[in-house]
């Protein structure tokens, strides 16, 4: 319905301590259109500069990407969907995830002066996701 006002949903500091987290309070209906925005940074643990961008991390490995799961879009990297609108074909909850090989030391702690590899997190806050649903 073109007249339907968008519903805006925010997830501040999505869970990055496991592969996938379901957010049952954010439900989609068949036919929804979802505009996806996301940003910020995550503590990936380890040694040295360990904060990485949530959407498009600068890293020597193929890890540390934020993931999204919408009905019909399972474990997709946010990097390829931010700034786009997707069509939801079936009902279901939001699932957000994270790519890593050691989830136990991830989070949003010990930022201090750690702006990440190559200062990629300079001026950025903690990770977030915003969805506009119509």
What are these regions, as identified by a protein language model?
Residues 1-134:
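Gly-Asp-aromatic-enriched flexible segments
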